[in-house]
């Protein structure tokens, strides 16, 4: 398995656990590949402790050529937009007063072709804000308007990360809309909320993970370039969402093991999952600081001398907005006629909180990472 993919997975799990601590009972969703791409670009312009910290937090210790690795991943993932309604926007905006060095510009030109943009926060703040908002709105087909709130940038902003990611999935096998029914979703042991539950009987890759008393299933999207993996506890056994045991044992090694094909086998499954749309704006700064990014956000300690000779330059803010829509839509079902009367081998009824990832199967990179706790 490739070193960059392992690094990206480790960072994804670290940040997911931080976000779960911040929001133990709420829905969590982010795009790890967007954030790691943007921070890896910032690392190219960083030196000393700042560069080292980014490398440690992103687990780049064993990655030989980080920019080239991301160039390859970006190129592979960009091809997905012809198959899916998928947009992954990863921008690093730099104020023009920094006078970026020619070395930095040339070293980032190919690997980060569309990720770096020079703007004018200092003298044309409102105009620049409007340009960024319009640009993100256009790039996401109108899904995200006004991604920059009034207080997210000011005339002192030097470096800004903006991530915007959305995905409306089309399944390999579509769910029949007539089978979607309102059902109670158990948010904990005692409380329920109504949810539209999609139902299907078909063959899927599924397994049991006994150490965490949990089921895992792989649900492929059209063309099988992307899959959604769902980790569902067999029941709500703790006093919160039922996910405590999984969250405790979750790390990059266990996730890799759980999603390994050897953990699962093809089975006839009676499947029920919620139809949902989650839109999240997260502020990952505090989480990133907890993970060890101490220098990058402070003008007193950050070192971006690899991109500019200007002193006292820090990463001012990280804006990260994601939207995921899961519906019945998909390709024609290829189940054999009469499959309904086959004996069922297994059942997966996601009527209580679950953890999920959406993975690019070719590179095994995690595009979205989330937990669904409440409709």
From Swiss-Prot:
SUPFAM superfamilies recorded: Serpins
Disulfide bond residue pairs: none
Presence of the UniProt keyword Disulfide bond in the record: no
Annotated glycan sites: 99, 133, 188, 361
Tissue specificity remark: Normal mammary epithelial cells.
Name of one Pfam family that matches: Serpin
Tagged with keyword Glycoprotein: yes
The entry's keywords: Glycoprotein, Secreted
Site annotation Reactive bond homolog: residues: 340-341
GO terms under biological process: extracellular matrix organization; morphogenesis of an epithelium; prostate gland morphogenesis; regulation of epithelial cell proliferation
Domain of life assignment: Eukaryota
A GO CC annotation given for this chain: cytoplasm
Subcellular location(s) of the protein: Secreted, Extracellular space
UniProt xrefs under CDD domains: serpinB5_maspin
Complex formation: Interacts with IRF6.
Function field: Tumor suppressor. It blocks the growth, invasion, and metastatic properties of mammary tumors. As it does not undergo the S (stressed) to R (relaxed) conformational transition characteristic of active serpins, it exhibits no serine protease inhibitory activity.
Family under the similarity heading: Belongs to the serpin family. Ov-serpin subfamily.
Protein name as annotated: Serpin B5
Lineage start: Eukaryota, Metazoa, Chordata, Craniata, Vertebrata
Gene this chain is encoded by: SERPINB5
């Amino acid at each position: 398995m490739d070193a960059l993919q392992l690094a990206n997975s480790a960072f994804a799990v670290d940040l997911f656990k931080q976000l779960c601590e911040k929001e133990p009972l709420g829905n969590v969703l982010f795009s790890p590949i967007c954030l790691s791409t943007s921070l890896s670009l910032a690392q190219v312009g960083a030196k000393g402790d700042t560069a080292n910290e980014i490398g440690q937090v992103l687990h780049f210790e064993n990655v030989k050529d980080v920019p080239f690795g991301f160039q390859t991943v970006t190129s592979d993932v960009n091809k997905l937009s012809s198959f899916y309604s998928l947009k992954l926007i990863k921008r690093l905006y730099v104020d023009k007063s920094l006078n970026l060095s020619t070395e930095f510009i040339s070293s980032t030109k190919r690997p980060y072709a569309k990720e770096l943009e020079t703007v004018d926060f200092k003298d044309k703040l409102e105009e620049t804000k409007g340009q960024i908002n319009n640009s993100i709105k256009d790039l996401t087909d109108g899904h995200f308007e006004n991604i920059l709130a009034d207080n997210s940038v000011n005339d002192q902003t030097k470096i800004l990360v903006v991530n915007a990611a959305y995905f409306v999935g089309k399944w390999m096998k579509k769910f029949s809309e007539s089978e979607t029914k309102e059902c109670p979703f158990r948010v904990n042991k005692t409380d329920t909320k109504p949810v539209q539950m999609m139902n299907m009987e078909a063959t899927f890759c599924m397994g049991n993970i006994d150490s965490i008393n949990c089921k895992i299933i792989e649900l492929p999207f059209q063309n099988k370039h992307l899959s959604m993996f769902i980790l569902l506890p067999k029941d709500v056994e703790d006093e919160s969402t039922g996910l405590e045991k999984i969250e405790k044992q979750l790390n990059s090694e266990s996730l890799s093991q759980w999603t390994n094909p050897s953990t699962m086998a093809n089975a006839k499954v009676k499947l029920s999952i919620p139809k949902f749309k989650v839109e999240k704006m997260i502020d990952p700064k505090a989480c990133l600081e907890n993970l060890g990014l101490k220098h990058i956000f402070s003008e007193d300690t950050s070192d971006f001398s690899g991109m500019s000779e200007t002193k006292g330059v820090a990463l001012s803010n990280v804006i990260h907005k994601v939207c995921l829509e899961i519906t019945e839509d998909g390709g024609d079902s290829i189940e054999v006629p009469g499959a309904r009367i086959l004996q069922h081998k297994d059942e997966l009824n996601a009527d209580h909180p679950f953890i999920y990832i959406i993975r690019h199967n070719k590179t095994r990179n995690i595009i979205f990472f989330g937990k669904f706790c409440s409709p």
